[in-house]
Amino acid sequence: MWHKIEISENNIEASTDKAVLIKMKHNSNFDGFVFWHPKKLVRAEGKMFTFSFNDEFKFNLKKYGNGKWNSRDVVREENIGANGMLAEWAL
């Protein structure tokens, strides 16, 4: 089954030709984490965006350092499934 989550433009951190870097929302258990999602599964709908995924989708969440010297270093990494992602955005 396919799922769709609506996000704000503020949750889009970066975009390339093939993928979009999405920030997790602030009041979730993964505040500060980001993940890459295929661009073909991200749609602009007015001022909001949606990203779609199916039940088998696995998300690799990464948290980067905040300092001047470690801003490109992954300081923590978590993997969650489709149900975990739905639960985080439902908070």
Task: Describe each region flagged by the PLM.
Residues 1-91:
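Conserved active-site motif detector
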